[in-house]
Protein backbone atom coordinates (compact mmCIF):
# COMPACT_ATOMS: atom_id res chain seq x y z
CA UNK A 1 0.00 0.00 0.00
CA UNK A 2 1.49 3.33 -0.96
CA UNK A 3 1.68 6.29 1.40
CA UNK A 4 -1.25 8.13 -0.24
CA UNK A 5 -3.61 5.19 0.24
CA UNK A 6 -2.54 4.93 3.88
CA UNK A 7 -3.13 8.66 4.47
CA UNK A 8 -6.54 8.44 2.80
CA UNK A 9 -7.54 5.48 4.98
CA UNK A 10 -6.38 7.28 8.15
CA UNK A 11 -8.24 10.44 7.14
CA UNK A 12 -11.48 8.51 6.61
CA UNK A 13 -11.07 6.78 9.99
CA UNK A 14 -10.52 10.08 11.80
CA UNK A 15 -13.54 11.64 10.09
CA UNK A 16 -15.82 8.75 11.05
CA UNK A 17 -14.59 8.64 14.66
CA UNK A 18 -14.78 12.42 15.27
CA UNK A 19 -17.14 13.12 18.17
CA UNK A 20 -19.96 15.43 17.01
CA UNK A 21 -20.57 16.39 20.66
CA UNK A 22 -16.99 17.53 21.31
CA UNK A 23 -16.24 21.15 22.19
CA UNK A 24 -19.62 22.02 23.73
CA UNK A 25 -20.19 24.00 26.92
CA UNK A 26 -23.08 22.44 28.84
CA UNK A 27 -25.27 24.36 31.27
CA UNK A 28 -27.98 23.09 33.60
CA UNK A 29 -31.39 23.78 32.07
CA UNK A 30 -32.88 24.83 35.43
CA UNK A 31 -30.99 28.12 34.96
CA UNK A 32 -33.46 28.95 32.19
CA UNK A 33 -37.26 29.17 31.92
CA UNK A 34 -39.24 25.98 32.57
CA UNK A 35 -42.75 26.30 31.13
CA UNK A 36 -46.07 24.42 30.99
CA UNK A 37 -46.19 23.35 34.62
CA UNK A 38 -49.35 23.87 36.62
CA UNK A 39 -47.38 24.43 39.84
CA UNK A 40 -43.92 25.78 40.56
CA UNK A 41 -43.57 24.12 43.98
CA UNK A 42 -42.85 20.58 42.75
CA UNK A 43 -40.20 18.51 44.54
CA UNK A 44 -38.23 18.14 41.31
CA UNK A 45 -37.96 20.66 38.45
CA UNK A 46 -39.33 18.36 35.73
CA UNK A 47 -42.32 16.79 37.50
CA UNK A 48 -45.84 18.11 37.19
CA UNK A 49 -47.54 17.83 40.60
CA UNK A 50 -46.56 19.09 44.06
CA UNK A 51 -45.89 16.33 46.60
CA UNK A 52 -48.94 17.43 48.67
CA UNK A 53 -51.28 15.98 46.03
CA UNK A 54 -49.59 12.58 45.82
CA UNK A 55 -51.46 11.02 48.77
CA UNK A 56 -54.80 11.50 47.02
CA UNK A 57 -53.55 9.94 43.74
CA UNK A 58 -53.93 6.29 42.78
CA UNK A 59 -50.68 4.34 42.29
CA UNK A 60 -51.11 4.48 38.49
CA UNK A 61 -51.41 8.26 38.67
CA UNK A 62 -48.33 8.49 40.87
CA UNK A 63 -46.38 6.71 38.12
CA UNK A 64 -47.49 9.42 35.69
CA UNK A 65 -46.37 12.08 38.16
CA UNK A 66 -42.80 11.48 37.04
CA UNK A 67 -43.56 11.86 33.33
CA UNK A 68 -42.50 15.22 31.91
CA UNK A 69 -45.28 15.37 29.27
CA UNK A 70 -45.82 18.93 28.08
CA UNK A 71 -42.97 20.48 30.05
CA UNK A 72 -40.49 22.53 28.02
CA UNK A 73 -37.39 24.65 28.62
CA UNK A 74 -37.08 28.10 26.97
CA UNK A 75 -33.76 29.82 26.27
CA UNK A 76 -31.95 32.08 23.81
CA UNK A 77 -28.52 31.60 22.26
CA UNK A 78 -26.28 32.75 19.43
CA UNK A 79 -24.54 29.38 19.22
CA UNK A 80 -23.94 27.88 15.79
CA UNK A 81 -24.58 24.43 17.28
CA UNK A 82 -27.08 23.23 19.89
CA UNK A 83 -26.96 19.92 21.74
CA UNK A 84 -28.47 18.38 24.85
CA UNK A 85 -27.70 15.70 27.40
CA UNK A 86 -30.38 14.34 29.69
CA UNK A 87 -30.75 11.65 32.30
CA UNK A 88 -33.85 9.44 31.98
CA UNK A 89 -35.72 8.32 35.09
CA UNK A 90 -37.07 4.99 33.81
CA UNK A 91 -35.82 4.35 30.26
CA UNK A 92 -38.51 1.74 29.62
CA UNK A 93 -39.83 0.36 26.34
CA UNK A 94 -43.31 0.08 24.81
CA UNK A 95 -44.11 -2.38 22.01
CA UNK A 96 -46.63 -0.04 20.40
CA UNK A 97 -44.73 3.26 20.37
CA UNK A 98 -41.48 4.60 18.96
CA UNK A 99 -38.79 5.57 21.45
CA UNK A 100 -38.91 9.16 20.20
CA UNK A 101 -42.48 9.36 21.52
CA UNK A 102 -41.66 7.75 24.84
CA UNK A 103 -38.39 9.40 25.78
CA UNK A 104 -37.25 11.69 22.99
CA UNK A 105 -36.85 15.46 23.23
CA UNK A 106 -37.72 18.05 20.57
CA UNK A 107 -35.93 21.31 19.77
CA UNK A 108 -38.00 24.21 18.38
CA UNK A 109 -36.87 27.59 17.04
CA UNK A 110 -38.98 30.77 17.14
CA UNK A 111 -39.35 32.25 13.66
CA UNK A 112 -39.79 35.84 14.84
CA UNK A 113 -40.81 37.14 11.41
CA UNK A 114 -43.79 34.79 11.29
CA UNK A 115 -44.19 34.51 15.09
CA UNK A 116 -44.40 30.70 14.89
CA UNK A 117 -42.41 27.91 16.49
CA UNK A 118 -40.71 25.64 13.95
CA UNK A 119 -39.48 22.11 14.66
CA UNK A 120 -35.69 21.77 14.30
CA UNK A 121 -34.90 18.19 15.31
CA UNK A 122 -35.78 15.32 17.64
CA UNK A 123 -33.47 13.39 19.94
CA UNK A 124 -33.74 9.73 18.98
CA UNK A 125 -32.88 7.91 22.21
CA UNK A 126 -30.41 5.05 22.30
CA UNK A 127 -31.65 1.89 23.99
CA UNK A 128 -28.72 1.68 26.45
CA UNK A 129 -30.03 -1.80 27.39
CA UNK A 130 -33.11 -0.10 28.86
CA UNK A 131 -31.28 0.67 32.08
CA UNK A 132 -32.96 3.21 34.29
CA UNK A 133 -30.92 6.35 34.90
CA UNK A 134 -29.42 6.27 31.39
CA UNK A 135 -27.86 9.39 29.87
CA UNK A 136 -28.92 10.42 26.37
CA UNK A 137 -26.96 12.85 24.19
CA UNK A 138 -28.04 14.64 21.02
CA UNK A 139 -26.60 17.14 18.58
CA UNK A 140 -29.79 18.85 17.40
CA UNK A 141 -28.40 21.27 14.84
CA UNK A 142 -25.19 22.84 13.52
CA UNK A 143 -24.13 25.49 10.98
CA UNK A 144 -26.52 28.12 12.37
CA UNK A 145 -26.00 31.82 11.59
CA UNK A 146 -24.49 32.83 14.97
CA UNK A 147 -27.25 35.39 15.69
CA UNK A 148 -29.34 35.39 18.88
CA UNK A 149 -32.47 33.27 18.47
CA UNK A 150 -35.16 31.88 20.76
CA UNK A 151 -35.38 28.11 21.35
CA UNK A 152 -37.51 25.61 23.25
CA UNK A 153 -36.82 21.97 24.16
CA UNK A 154 -39.86 19.79 24.84
CA UNK A 155 -39.21 16.95 27.29
CA UNK A 156 -40.23 13.25 27.02
CA UNK A 157 -43.91 12.26 26.93
CA UNK A 158 -43.89 8.87 28.69
CA UNK A 159 -40.75 9.11 30.78
CA UNK A 160 -39.25 11.66 33.09
CA UNK A 161 -35.81 13.16 33.43
CA UNK A 162 -33.60 13.74 36.44
CA UNK A 163 -31.62 16.49 34.76
CA UNK A 164 -31.13 18.24 31.42
CA UNK A 165 -28.07 20.10 30.16
CA UNK A 166 -28.11 22.40 27.12
CA UNK A 167 -24.96 22.37 25.01
CA UNK A 168 -23.70 25.35 23.00
CA UNK A 169 -20.39 26.46 21.46
CA UNK A 170 -17.82 27.29 24.14
CA UNK A 171 -17.86 31.05 23.44
CA UNK A 172 -21.60 31.40 22.70
CA UNK A 173 -24.13 33.32 24.80
CA UNK A 174 -26.79 31.19 26.47
CA UNK A 175 -29.44 33.21 28.30
CA UNK A 176 -33.00 33.33 29.55
CA UNK A 177 -35.48 33.94 26.72
CA UNK A 178 -35.75 37.56 25.57
CA UNK A 179 -39.28 37.16 24.21
CA UNK A 180 -42.37 36.00 26.12
CA UNK A 181 -43.60 33.31 23.76
CA UNK A 182 -45.73 31.39 24.43
CA UNK A 183 -47.41 34.16 26.43
CA UNK A 184 -48.91 33.54 29.86
CA UNK A 185 -52.61 34.29 29.46
CA UNK A 186 -54.12 32.08 32.14
CA UNK A 187 -54.35 28.32 32.52
CA UNK A 188 -56.14 25.81 30.31
CA UNK A 189 -57.15 22.33 31.46
CA UNK A 190 -57.80 19.74 28.75
CA UNK A 191 -59.43 16.43 29.66
CA UNK A 192 -59.34 13.53 27.22
CA UNK A 193 -57.65 10.34 26.09
CA UNK A 194 -53.94 9.89 25.38
CA UNK A 195 -54.62 11.29 21.89
CA UNK A 196 -54.86 14.73 23.56
CA UNK A 197 -51.19 14.63 24.53
CA UNK A 198 -49.92 13.12 21.29
CA UNK A 199 -49.97 9.45 22.32
Identify what each model region corresponds to.
Residues 185-199:
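Catalytic nucleophile-elbow at a beta strand-turn-alpha helix junction centered on a G-D-S/GDSL motif
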Residues 1-20:
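Bacterial Sec-dependent N-terminal signal peptides
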Amino acid sequence: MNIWMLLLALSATLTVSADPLAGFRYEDATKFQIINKGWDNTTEPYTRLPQQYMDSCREEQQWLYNHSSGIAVRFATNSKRIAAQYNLKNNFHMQHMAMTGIKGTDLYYLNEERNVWEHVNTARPQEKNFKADSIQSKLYVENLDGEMHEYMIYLPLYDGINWLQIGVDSTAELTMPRVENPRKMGKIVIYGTSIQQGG
